[in-house]
Structure formats: structure tokens, C-alpha cells
UniProtKB/Swiss-Prot annotation:
Taxonomy of the source species: Bacteria, Bacillati, Cyanobacteriota, Cyanophyceae, Synechococcales
Listed GO MF terms: 2-phosphosulfolactate phosphatase activity; magnesium ion binding; sulfopyruvate decarboxylase activity
Name of the protein: Probable 2-phosphosulfolactate phosphatase
Pfam families: 2-ph_phosp
This enzyme's EC code(s): 3.1.3.71
Similarity annotation: Belongs to the ComB family.
Endpoints of the signal sequence: none
First-tier enzyme category under EC: hydrolase
Species annotation: Parasynechococcus marenigrum (strain WH8102)
Alphabetic keyword roster: Hydrolase, Magnesium
Length: 242
């Protein structure tokens, strides 16, 4: 299994055709997706475009849907929730479809939606994703960071390194296929004893701190190997728990 890491979706070659893709947005989309599905959401349907989201949501029964919208770290007006993993509790999301659009994560998902096996990862479901990849045994895996508005993201690279390192621990058949994957693994080794500190140090972590009290979000996003859920694309843009 060859592991490639791309810091942002635009770095992935246009002609790339990996057997599997793993999208990461630690702060906070893929963490929120994992917790929402763990807490019983029927599915998370991701959108890069807000008008597309609204149109799809309108076709869904009102009592079975929630709109999750975030731009610049803040909840969008008229949406039920923002992008906080601690807000997607069972009483709120169980049995519902979540129509979601965020600054970075859902756009990254849109870039790789044609890949045969598409999953999302965050620190809380790292082990589950690693085990799923080993079970499926794709020849090539593209880990795609969401970044921040097209630029490098420290926390996404941390999680990419955490996943790549765990895959290498579990199987000698796993190789790191580009320098970005090697660098991400080294980053994980540097911060693995205190991932929350890395998240807070990152520029997007600092952005969230300036926006207000996000301590619960930081703790949630930094929690390692807590979930068994693997959000998996079942149809274009639609992620369900597998």
C-alpha cells in the first residue's frame, strides 16, 4: 500500500487516480462528521456550494434534516448548527440527515468524490480508518488535507502523519510514497504526546481561540482513537457510518 499525502486538494494531480482517498479536516469538519455519525445521524451530505445545499435540503423532510454551515470558523445565519463536534449530540442529530458546508473540509471532499473508496479521518477515528484501509487493501491511498483557504494546515498534517504512522506500525507492506507523507509522519512523532498543543499552536487553532471559547472543541478534536466509525461515501457527497 502506497501512501501519498497532499497538503491541500489543489496539490493532488489532476490525473491522479488513487484507489482510495482519505480527507482530513481536523479543525473541525471531519471530526464533526465522525462524531455526528457516531451519535446516530443517518448521513452527512457535504456541499461546497451553499445554494446546492439549500436545494438538496429542501427536498428532504423538514423534521429529518439539519443544516450545518460554517465560514471563517463561525456559524452561518439561518443554519441549525455550525461546525462544532461537541454540538452534534444524539438528541440533536440521531436519525437525521445533516446537510453540511464548511470553509475547507467539504470543498476537499468535493475534489475527490470520484475516488472508488472515499473516507474521512480525524484523530478520534484514526485507528478505525487505519483498520478499514488495511481490510480493503487499496494499492494507492491519497490522504488529502483540507488546509485553510488553499494553504497549508499544521493540524491536518498532524492527523495525516498519525494515520500514516499507524498504518506503518500495523503492516510492513505500507510505504510512504511522497515527501509530504514522510514529513507528516515526522510531525506526528514530534507532537504525538500532546496533539492538543499542536492544534492550539496551528494558525487555525489560533483563529478559533480569537473567536471565543473553543476549549471543548479542541479537546474533542485532539482525542485519539476514541471512535470506531469510518465515514464512507456511499453516493456522491453522502457519507454514512461503516
Amino acid at each position: 500500500m502506497q501512501i501519498f499525502y497532499f497538503h491541500v486538494p489543489a496539490e493532488m494531480p489532476a490525473d491522479a487516480s488513487p484507489d482510495a482517498a482519505v480527507v482530513i479536516d481536523v479543525l473541525r469538519a471531519t471530526t464533526t462528521i465522525a462524531w455526528a455519525l457516531h451519535h446516530g445521524a443517518e448521513a452527512v451530505q457535504a456541499f461546497a456550494d451553499l445554494e446546492d445545499l439549500r436545494a438538496a435540503a429542501e427536498a428532504w423532510p423538514a423534521d429529518q434534516r439539519l443544516l450545518l454551515g460554517e465560514r471563517g470558523g463561525q456559524t452561518l445565519a439561518g443554519f441549525d448548527l455550525g461546525n462544532s463536534p461537541v454540538a452534534v449530540v444524539p438528541a440533536t442529530v440521531s436519525g437525521k440527515r445533516l446537510f453540511m458546508s464548511t470553509t475547507n473540509g467539504t470543498r476537499a471532499l468535493d475534489r475527490v468524490r470520484q475516488v472508488p473508496l472515499l473516507v474521512t479521518a480525524a484523530l478520534p477515528n484514526r485507528e478505525a480508518v487505519a483498520q478499514r484501509l488495511l481490510k480493503e487493501s487499496p494499492e494507492t491511498v491519497a490522504i488529502v488535507g483540507s488546509g485553510w483557504e488553499g494553504t497549508y494546515s499544521l493540524e491536518d498534517s498532524l492527523a495525516a502523519g498519525a494515520l500514516a504512522a499507524r498504518l506503518q506500525e500495523l503492516s510492513q507492506a505500507v510505504t510512504l510514497a511522497n515527501d509530504e507523507a514522510t514529513a507528516a509522519t515526522a510531525l506526528w512523532q514530534q507532537w504525538r504526546h500532546d496533539p492538543e498543543a499542536c492544534l492550539r499552536t496551528a494558525s487555525h487553532g489560533q483563529r478559533l481561540i480569537r473567536l471565543g471559547d473553543h476549549d471543548d472543541d479542541f479537546r474533542c478534536c485532539a482525542g485519539l482513537d476514541q471512535l470506531s466509525v469510518v465515514p464512507t461515501q456511499q453516493s456522491p457527497g453522502v457519507l454514512q457510518a461503516i
